[in-house]
Regions:
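Short acidic, glycine/proline-rich loop/turn micro-motifs
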Residues: 16-20, 58-59, 154-155
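Substrate-recognition element of Asp-dependent hydrolases with the DxDx(T/V) motif
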Residues: 32, 36-69, 84-95, 134
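Short phosphate-binding/catalytic loops that engage adenosine nucleotides
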Residues: 44, 81, 139
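Short, electropositive alpha-helical surface patch
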Residues: 58-73, 98-110
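Structural recognition of alpha->loop->beta junctions
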Residues: 69-85, 154-176
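Conserved Lys-Pro-Asp/Glu-containing loop-to-beta segment of HAD-superfamily phosphomonoesterases
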Residues: 98-131
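Acidic, Mg2+-coordinating phosphoryl-transfer loop and its flanking beta/alpha structural elements
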Residues: 123-166
Length: 177
């Protein structure tokens, strides 16, 4: 089984400092949906791992988060792909939960669900917390320069062996070719 972990905001869709609070605000980054379809055609199981603290902050509710994810699922399917699962942390940063990236709880849940360790599994993100959570589990951290990725790269201090690509489409081209 080929598994790949993708952050959502800034990797699949455009991010916003004001959060993605409705399905209308969810807009895919050009090439990302087709990239997910290519992964599926290459027999990858695509798993989204995303912090969604807007729920914990009261900016939107679970119904709205599910509607956003439903829109994403439909858009990916329309492009010929499939997201196997979405794991998310709904807690605000001050909740001190174990599932919020950069902590490893969400990644541990994914490993348990798929009955595997994540050693070497590609984990694509645009923030240091995405890359740190991946590295803690032995996954391969991959930074994309979309979303907050360029700022993350400029700030430095990336986990050892982090790969850097312009966007998800470039990551997928590297993986499947």
């Amino acid at each position: 089984m080929n598994l790949i972990l993708l952050d959502r905001d800034g990797v699949i869709n455009y991010d916003s400092d004001q959060f993605i609070k409705s399905p209308e605000e969810w807009k895919p980054i050009p090439g990302s949906l087709e990239a997910i379809a290519r992964l599926c055609q290459a027999d990858y199981r695509v798993v989204v791992a995303t912090n969604q603290s807007g729920v914990g902050r009261g900016l939107f509710d679970m119904y709205t988060l599910n509607a956003i994810h439903d829109k994403m699922h439909k858009a990916v399917a329309q492009a010929g792909g499939r997201i196997d699962a979405i794991f998310f942390c709904p807690h605000a940063a001050d909740a001190n939960c174990s599932c919020r990236k950069p902590k490893s709880g969400m990644m541990e849940d994914i490993a348990t669900r798929y009955n595997t360790n994540l050693k070497g599994v590609p984990a694509v993100g645009d923030s240091l917390r995405d890359l740190t959570a991946a590295a803690r589990m032995g996954a391969q951290p991959i930074l994309v320069l979309t979303g907050k990725g360029a700022k993350t790269q400029a700030a430095g201090d990336l986990p050892e062996d982090t790969l850097i690509y312009p966007d998800l489409a470039a990551v997928v081209a590297m993986l499947v070719e």
